[in-house]
């Protein structure tokens, strides 16, 4: 089998507000400027621009899994932000900007993901967290023979510090997931 057609394609950021094709809340230039002001900048600086772009896109995707207060400014916009019809600290959200806390969360999560690409999804393998969980006659068993990538229900589970940036904007989580339950 030959090389992938996409192997040499660089990730491209589209951070245009309300765009139908936006894939990031911030540009690479904004992220680089942010990391000039933080102590851990070398963890970001030592990455290629392509790795940084991929991390910013991935961070945005994970942030977009959360449920936010307010409404999208445009029904056709690709991302959850910008939003309106909600106040944070008596300041109304505006369609003309993404709040700084959303941007800070994107920068910090991108940095974390760039330095640990498997942190949220887990690694491929045949082990799970639990063989089984039993409560009376009810028992939950995880399929430990699966070679599928692991999953985490909520980005806050892995990076609880994100709540300090996003908590005022979030309804409380990214939703639920299904678990197969078997009676013993």
PLM feature spans:
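Divalent metal-cofactor coordination and adjacent catalytic microenvironments
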Residues: 2-184
């Amino acid at each position: 089998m030959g090389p992938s057609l996409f192997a040499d394609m660089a990730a491209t950021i589209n951070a245009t507000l309300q765009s139908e094709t936006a894939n990031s809340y911030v540009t690479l230039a904004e992220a680089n400027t942010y990391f000039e002001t933080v102590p851990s900048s070398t963890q970001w600086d030592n990455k290629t621009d392509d790795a940084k772009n991929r991390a910013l896109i991935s961070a945005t995707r994970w942030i977009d899994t959360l449920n936010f207060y307010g409404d999208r400014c445009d029904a056709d916009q690709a991302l959850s932000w910008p939003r309106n019809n909600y106040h944070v600290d008596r300041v109304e959200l505006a369609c003309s900007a993404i709040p700084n806390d959303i941007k800070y969360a994107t920068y910090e999560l991108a940095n974390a993901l760039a330095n640990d690409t498997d942190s949220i999804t887990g690694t491929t393998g045949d082990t799970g967290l639990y063989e089984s969980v039993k409560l009376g006659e009810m028992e939950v068993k995880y399929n430990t023979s699966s070679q599928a990538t692991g999953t985490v229900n909520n980005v806050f589970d892995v990076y609880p510090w994100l709540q300090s940036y996003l908590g005022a904007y979030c309804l409380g989580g990214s939703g639920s997931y299904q678990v197969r339950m078997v009676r013993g």
